[in-house]
């Protein structure tokens, strides 16, 4: 078969125009083209047809050093990456090349990063709770197996730490495979996460096939094309795990889905499309839908997705985070005000919600305790203005009691993390759902009204709080 060869006619930042002449067939949209820049393979993805013989492409690698007249080969297919067991314990880039210095990924199976979502008839509708061991999440905004969870928060409130704790808790307790897509985040954090996984045994360097996680990175320093596609590459690996061996439960982490949108906006501007609200791409909802609709459970296996979503300037009405809302089953909102109080995880118990916090799914007791906790916290929030102006003394006895309980609940929602042990020196805690419900039930019923607030800060179960109170009294 004769190769379809074109030549570069123009390079503007990450956009490359390639001309196909001499009866060459024009490559299809989304086809991967290859060229070699100082022996370095560069992959270009066809984005637009310009005229009869030119295609406009987005580069997946650095265009530095590309020159006009350089030969480009049409592969005839979209980007394909290795999938399956061979990817475990490895880090690859958007086009499936290893970036961990451990040699080629020897997989017998490769797969296109573009796939349709599963048919309706094959999708599963069952709902089971995924216990994370994190009190505030399990009680107030529980996650579902096969659900989509959004972690919302501004810069520096703890999204990545929470994701690392979820990988630690859920991957170990759950036993399935995990895929982590690093989309446009800090390279240092990606490196830290990799070494953290090696230290905790999630990645086994001696026998990579025994590892529990595959990593796909397209970090901040990569061109927008790579950042716009790396989430699809990660999802393709997650789908391969879900569908293998008659089905698996897979965890799919994306850090950060906002960077996926941001890269899409950059690509859109480079291609000359007219921007929509706040400068985002006109195809924002379509791009997000194509990714999110593939993250789903079938009758054989599930993909549970946790997506960190950076909120620009803490504005939840920004088109990027608000477009994500429509696809999520649960939202965990991280609050700067709570982080400023020193309460970690800084999850906002009133803003965070979940579709499965329903008595038919979680049970009557869990639902009742969660709603009582929220009611106490909401009352405290509404009283804060009065306290700020008039002070605590002006409150009724009933309101004083509510404030006291709310402050204890607020502190009891904090928890030491395993992945933060190295920073805090405090042993991490995994709290079972029954212990979480029992602890908060006792708090709202007033069983622990006599204990000091400090006893509830950074503990696991309620028994630990009681023990801490005894130590504080000494």
From Swiss-Prot:
Entry's EC annotation? 7.1.2.2
Instruction: List ligand-binding residues for ATP.
Output: 153-160
This molecule's function is given as: Produces ATP from ADP in the presence of a proton gradient across the membrane. The catalytic sites are hosted primarily by the beta subunits.
- What family does this belong to? Belongs to the ATPase alpha/beta chains family.
Task: Name the chemical reaction catalysed here.
Answer: ATP + H2O + 4 H(+)(in) = ADP + phosphate + 5 H(+)(out)
List locations, semicolon-separated.
Cell inner membrane
The entry's protein name is ATP synthase subunit beta
Q: List, in alphabetical order, the Gene Ontology terms for molecular function in this entry.
A: ATP binding; ATP hydrolysis activity; proton-transporting ATP synthase activity, rotational mechanism
Task: Quote the gene name from the UniProt entry.
Answer: atpD
């Amino acid at each position: 078969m004769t190769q379809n060869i074109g030549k570069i006619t123009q390079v503007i930042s990450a956009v490359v125009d390639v001309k196909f002449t001499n009866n060459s067939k024009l490559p299809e949209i989304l086809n991967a083209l290859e060229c070699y820049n100082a022996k370095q393979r560069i992959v270009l993805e066809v984005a637009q047809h310009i005229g009869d013989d030119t295609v406009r492409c987005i580069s997946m690698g650095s265009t530095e050093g590309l020159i006009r007249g350089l030969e480009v080969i049409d592969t005839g297919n979209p980007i394909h990456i290795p999938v399956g067991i061979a990817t475990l314990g490895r880090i690859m880039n958007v086009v499936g090349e290893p970036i961990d210095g451990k040699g080629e990924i020897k997989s017998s199976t490769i797969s296109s990063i573009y796939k349709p979502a599963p048919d309706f008839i094959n999708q599963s509708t069952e709902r089971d709770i995924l216990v994370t061991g994190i009190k505030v999440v399990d009680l107030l905004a529980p996650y579902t197996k096969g659900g989509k969870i959004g972690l919302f928060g501004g810069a520096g409130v703890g999204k990545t730490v929470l994701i690392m704790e979820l990988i630690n808790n859920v991957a170990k307790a759950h036993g399935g495979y995990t895929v982590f897509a690093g989309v446009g985040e800090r390279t240092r954090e990606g490196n830290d996460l990799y070494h953290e996984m090696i230290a905790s045994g999630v990645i086994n360097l001696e026998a990579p096939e025994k590892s529990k996680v595959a990593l796909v990175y397209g970090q901040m320093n990569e061109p927008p094309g790579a950042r716009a596609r790396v989430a699809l590459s990660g999802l393709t690996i997650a789908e391969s795990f879900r569908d293998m061996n008659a089905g698996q439960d897979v965890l799919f982490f994306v850090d950060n889905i906002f960077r996926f949108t941001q890269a899409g906006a950059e690509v859109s501007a480079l291609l000359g499309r007219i921007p929509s609200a706040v400068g985002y791409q006109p195809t924002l909802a379509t791009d997000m839908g194509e990714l999110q609709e593939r993250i789903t459970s079938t009758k054989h296996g599930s993909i549970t997705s946790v997506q960190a979503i950076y909120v620009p300037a803490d504005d939840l009405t920004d088109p990027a985070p608000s477009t994500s809302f429509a696809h999520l089953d649960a939202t965990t909102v991280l609050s700067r005000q709570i982080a400023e109080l020193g309460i970690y995880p800084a999850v906002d118990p009133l803003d965070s919600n979940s579709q499965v916090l329903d008595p038919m799914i979680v049970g009557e007791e869990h639902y009742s305790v969660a709603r009582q906790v929220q009611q106490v916290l909401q009352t405290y929030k509404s009283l804060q203005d009065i306290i700020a102006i008039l002070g605590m003394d002006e409150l009724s006895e009933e309101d004083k009691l509510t404030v006291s309980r709310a402050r204890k609940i607020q502190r009891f929602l904090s928890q030491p993390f395993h992945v933060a042990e190295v920073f805090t020196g405090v042993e991490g805690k995994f709290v079972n759902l029954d212990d979480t419900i029992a602890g908060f039930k006792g708090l709202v019923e007033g069983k622990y009204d006599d204990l000091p607030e400090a006893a509830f800060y950074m503990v696991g179960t309620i028994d630990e709080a009681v023990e801490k109170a005894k130590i504080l009294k000494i």
